[in-house]
Amino acid sequence: MFRLKSVCVSRNVNAFYRSFASRNNVLFVLGAPGSGKGKHSDHLVAKFGGCHVSVGEILRETVKTPGKYTEMIQKHMNEGTLVPTEVTMELIRDKVMNSTNGVLLLDGYPRNMSNYKTWCDVMGDSCNVLGCLLYKCSYEFLEKRLIARGKDSGRADDNLEVIKRRFYSYEHETKEVLDKLREKYSIEEICTEPPFEEAFPNSVKAYCKIIKQNGLM
């Protein structure tokens, strides 16, 4: 499977890419678990350059090595609940601040109002939020996709009990932050129930629309 995680692709092909050289332009990428945020983000970065920082991947990588947050993060992952905001921000802050080449796709953040308020406090002066890509599928469709993924990946958070808790958390915590984001930013919705080859062109259109709205293309 084609995957790029928390990686920057440097492209100085034209003025579009050079215009980002010293700026932190961030595009939030949200959606329920299994909605395709990561795969679409990887392919957008491959097409347009920039960076993809996946909060979920950072957390999964963090628990592989013993450290001060390992047990706590693993517990939240096993239970399908959100890691405390201050921990998540500590883990992603440097990656976001050091990613100044192109648009940074921040995958899986902010997930709740605590995330968003902390973002505004810590990153608000140094990052320019362009908008949000919102990936959408029915929960029934996502449940089947995640169960199938769990058989291949062995991920602890891809079993039915945890999946349902993750959906509940997304439905009850992320809706509020999406309403808040809509007050300030453009949110482009992409349905990812069709096969990737059919859905990805809509990702490209949504991405380009937000970039153009910000005068960057």
Where are these predicted regions, by residue range?
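Glycine-rich phosphate-binding loop of ATP-dependent small-molecule kinases
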Residues: 1-217
